[in-house]
Amino acid sequence: MRVLETIVALREYRKSLEESVGFVPTMGALHKGHQSLIERSLKENSHTIVSVFVNPTQFGANEDFNAYPRPLEKDLALCEKLGVNAVFVPKIGEMYPYEAEQRLKLYAPKFLSSSLEGAMRKGHFDGVVQIVLKMFHLVNPTRAYFGKKDAQQLLIIEHLVKDLLLDIEIAPCEIVRDDDNLALSSRNVYLNATQRKQALAIPKALEKIQQAIDKGEKACEKLKKLGLEILETLEVDYLECCNHKLEPLTIIEPTNTLILVAARVGKTRLLDNLWV
């Protein structure tokens, strides 16, 4: 497995590849959710490149950029064990050669980025589209793999690829859950044992909503009320029912509905969702 630290090294390596290339962009602190993306890429492509880069432009002033876990050696060991061909681990100066005021500014489309996570984390998705587009230019993948857990991010990336006419297939990957049903996240390491038990209200709320939908309930307000009753011990940022353009719904639309939740357990903010 190659560990590539510079753009020059990545470009040289990429030029040597003639068959399909799968790309899994990450911020490191890899878990079984990332592993599932990597394994799918390995299955569907001749070569797989993983990036490990904690992107500063998608963190707000009061967010956890400096505290974000960075177990690089562990991440590299997992990638090698899985059979990844190359891992791109650039420094910030490689990806952002100019100071902030000198950079070309990219903005996520407002109709997808102004609500939900975008409302809670101003500028977050602008930073996401900036780094993802840079990575796409460098890696030039056949396919790129993104988890459905970050649903709003996935929809924005799909829009980016279509809008900018990029010849890249975006492969959405199912949410991976731990044995207790909590959606896997690099931020789960922040939870102590008590907080982890409290956090289980999130998947329980979504499970209750899914059960109601399966029984025929279609009214979004009733579904949200069911979920909020279970989430009452947590600090809920939002529990929303939207279509795939992130427009609020009053009635469930089969195959075009997302139930999205963000809640805080202590200082840790967790996301989860249902694709209906």
Swiss-Prot record:
Binding of (R)-pantoate, residues: Q58, Q153
Locations listed in the record: Cytoplasm
Domain of life of the organism encoding this protein: Bacteria
GO biological process: pantothenate biosynthetic process
Main location: cytoplasm
Matches recorded under InterPro entries: Cyt_trans-like, Pantoate_ligase, Pantoate_ligase_C, Rossmann-like_a/b/a_fold
Metabolic or biological pathway: Cofactor biosynthesis; (R)-pantothenate biosynthesis; (R)-pantothenate from (R)-pantoate and beta-alanine: step 1/1
Residues noted as binding ATP in the record, renumbered to the chain: 27-34, 147-150, 176, 184-187
Positions bound to beta-alanine: Q58
CDD domains: PanC
Reactions performed catalytically: (R)-pantoate + beta-alanine + ATP = (R)-pantothenate + AMP + diphosphate + H(+)
Sorted UniProt keywords: ATP-binding, Cytoplasm, Ligase, Nucleotide-binding, Pantothenate biosynthesis
GO MF, one example: ATP binding
Residues that span the membrane, as ranges: none
EC number, UniProt record: 6.3.2.1
GO cellular component, one term: cytosol
Record HAMAP family: PanC (MF_00158)
Subunit structure of this chain's protein: Homodimer.
Miscellaneous: The reaction proceeds by a bi uni uni bi ping pong mechanism.
NCBIfam families the record matches: cyt_tran_rel, panC
UniProt similarity note: Belongs to the pantothenate synthetase family.
Function (record text): Catalyzes the condensation of pantoate with beta-alanine in an ATP-dependent reaction via a pantoyl-adenylate intermediate.
Protein name per its UniProtKB record: Pantothenate synthetase
Gene: panC
